[in-house]
Amino acid sequence: MLQHHIEQHSVIDNQRLVVTLASTQAEIEDAQRLRYEIFAKEMGAKISSINGLDIDKYDEHCQHLIVKDEDNGCVVGCYRLLTIDGARKVGGWYSAGEFDLSRIEHVLERTVELGRACVHKDYRNGGVVLLLWTGLVKFMQLENLSYMIGCGSISMSDGGHTAASLYRKLEKKYLSPLEYRVFPHVPVQLDKLKQDLEVSTPALIKGYLRA
């Protein structure tokens, strides 16, 4: 089974961790519970919930990459992975609800969409993220995938000034060629926002840019 090829054990800061694909409904629900704890309770996101689980229509069509603490059995990190087969079954990519993906249509057959990435607050020492990325690379190799897409979160709590400044900061070096560029369905009106604030790049987005 695919999870056996991805599974990898590691000891980080005396924590015995393993990355694998969820193989039971209980493991998937543990990941959904972690997502709810972080996105809803910690970050204040307004998301639908069933019994304290973050669940939407995409979940049943995704693979769920998880990191577990082998000493207590808890899921302490997760990623949701959607490939072209799952996207067809659910009616499209999650990202397509936010962006026009037509310019990258030609690469979607070999693409994995990443979503719902999170790490338990007691395990944010970098080790869990490293294991998730190790598992992700292995998954892409086994599935013969070459591209990653997904939505990265940037706070809009200040009305969008931080987001606008971050965009201006990153576009100088990281803006993709036009033929690979996607466009938001509801764009931020940059000309109405401050674009010169000193801002930090969110850790997850910084990691993607280094990949």
Q: Locations of the language-model features?
A:
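Short amphipathic alpha-helix that is part of the acyltransferase structural core
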Residues: 4-85
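Acyl-donor binding region in acyl/amide transferases
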Residues: 84-211
